[in-house]
Regions:
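Hydrophobic residues within alpha-helical transmembrane segments
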Residues: 25, 29, 59-62, 102, ...
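Short alpha-helical transmembrane segments in multi-pass integral membrane proteins
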Residues: 1-24, 81-148, 190-246, 302-368, ...
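Helix-terminus/linker motif at the lipid-water interface of multi-pass membrane proteins
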Residues: 32, 36-54, 123-130, 186-193, ...
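Short runs within selected transmembrane alpha-helices of multi-pass transporters and secretion channels
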Residues: 74, 143-161, 169-177, 198-211, ...
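Small-residue-rich hydrophobic transmembrane alpha-helices
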Residues: 53-113, 150-169, 276-340, 372-394
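Hydrophobic transmembrane alpha-helices of multi-pass small-molecule transporters
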Residues: 65-68, 180-185, 210-214, 286-289, ...
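Transmembrane helical elements of multi-pass membrane transporters/channels
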Residues: 22-41, 142, 153, 176, ...
């Protein structure tokens, strides 16, 4: 009871800075650790050559689709589970947790099987050139099969977090990431296994994270049993899971689509461009995931304050989140822009074209990254306030609604520069849209506040 009261105090009455740090930082650290997987592979594989670096860049969006499946069931179930546990309905919560986990594994296995059968065609569609294809196949055959562990881990991460076991999720993520950092150079260079070694290192790291979650469950530390007997999907249960899970999956698919479109456009200019853009994607993802993680802590505060009609608290949460996230984005963006040459040089053996391409794109992405915090605060805010359609649209702008037309059209008129600057241009358009939607939202909030005040005076 005390723990539940403490959580309610954080959401409803604790100072905003304290509440944001308590709720946002653990998730932010978890997201940052997750991003390390992608960056570490790229860093060590880069020493093998541009085609090898291009190979893991091409395979990357395929892995993101699988992660999306885990997020769909895990994130979708987590919200429902928290509500069920809150009202003491442990039996239904058990069934939901088991159904979400086994559904994600089942559908994940089907996607993995399909991907394995049609792997070469999928990689070609994702932008693999003739010189990249052999390395992409070698890496993907192992990586795709190991994604069954990734689906399990992502789903469990969200489900276990819903019962408040943040230390377990942190341990699973951290152990896997640290192991991957150690195993990559061992398999890639010492055992001379190249990209195959990178895939094996990632697979082993994911398996170890899976073992952490299995140990947690088998020692009966979880409030959920995860028994196969509890697997009982009903229409109402799946509707509750998927109404949150499907938008999450769509956002993840848009990320995969944007990377795939960049790879396909880059393939017209050679392996160096694919490798350079792949490095930029992984570098910028370190920053974006930190902001996403922090704002996961902002959302429940905003939603609670809005539901409780505490408009002053809501405005303070919005203002503080914008200041903090923009300050972070300003520092990270300037580092990416000012040191773009030095940063991108760490991901190649000295390929001058890759350095030139990566430096230009990273510089531009660094400048527009300064705007990312403002954009993400409002895309998160709309969802937190229950304005699903607006939140979904705004969330889809940066890598979907705005990005897809830009990456399809701009290279036709601007050549390779159209690829390098597609994401920064989409970012600027997305922020302009955000400004108009934010102004409209604040007018709505002011009207709602006046209505509450007039009702209280009657």
């Amino acid at each position: 009871m005390n723990e539940r009261n403490n959580k309610l105090e954080l959401l409803g009455s604790a100072p905003i800075p304290k509440a944001l740090m308590a709720l946002g930082i653990p998730i932010m650290i978890g997201m940052l650790i997750n991003a390390l997987y992608n960056l570490v592979d790229a860093y060590f594989v880069a020493g093998l050559g541009k085609s090898q670096m291009g190979a893991i860049s091409v395979v990357f969006p395929l892995g993101q689709v699988v992660v999306g499946l885990g997020l769909m069931f895990g994130n979708g179930a987590a919200s429902y589970l928290s509500r069920l546990l809150g009202r003491g309905d442990k039996d239904t919560a058990n069934r939901v947790a088991s159904t979400a986990l086994y559904s994600s594994i089942l559908i994940g296995a089907i996607i993995i099987l399909f991907s394995t059968i049609f792997l070469k065609s999928i990689l070609a569609m994702l932008g693999a050139t003739e010189t990249i294809m052999p390395y992409a196949l070698t890496y993907a055959r192992i990586y795709v099969l190991s994604c069954v562990f990734n689906v399990f881990n992502v789903t469990m991460n969200n489900i276990v977090s819903s019962e408040g076991a943040a230390k377990t999720t942190m341990c699973a993520l951290l152990l896997g990431a640290v192991l991957n950092i150690g195993l990559d150079p061992l398999f890639i260079y010492i055992l001379d296994m190249g990209v195959e070694g990178a895939a094996i290192a990632t697979a082993i790291s994911q398996m170890v994270s899976t073992l952490v979650y299995l140990t947690y469950v088998l020692r009966k530390k979880s409030v959920f049993t995860f028994s196969i007997k509890e697997f009982s999907p009903t229409r109402q249960m799946m509707a509750e899971i998927l109404k949150i899970g499907v938008p999450t999956l769509v956002f993840q698919l848009l990320t995969s689509l944007s990377i795939a479109l960049i790879n396909r456009a880059s393939s017209n200019y050679g392996d160096s461009v694919i490798a350079g853009m792949g490095a930029v994607t992984r570098i910028t993802s370190m920053g974006t995931l930190v902001v996403f993680g922090f704002l996961k802590g902002f959302q429940p505060i905003a939603g609670f304050s809005y539901g409780a009609k505490k408009f002053d608290r809501l405005r303070e949460a919005i203002k503080t989140s914008i200041i903090w996230s923009t300050s972070f984005c300003l520092v990270v963006g300037l580092v990416m822009a000012v040191f773009s040459m030095q940063i991108i040089s760490q991901f190649t053996k000295g390929d001058t074209q890759m350095i030139l391409v990566g430096q230009k794109s990273l510089f531009a992405n660094g400048i527009t990254f300064i705007l990312f915090g403002f954009y993400t605060v409002y895309s998160s805010l709309f969802l937190a306030l229950g304005k699903g359609a607006a939140g979904f649209f705004l969330g889809a702008c940066r890598q979907g609604v705005c990005f897809v037309p830009v990456i399809l059209l701009l290279p036709m008129v601007w050549g390779m520069n159209g690829i390098l600057y597609a994401q920064p241009i989409a970012d600027v358009i997305s922020v302009v849209i955000t400004v108009f939607m934010a102004l409209h939202l604040h007018r709505e909030l002011s009207m709602a506040e006046k209505q509450v005040m007039s009702n209280s005076e009657m």
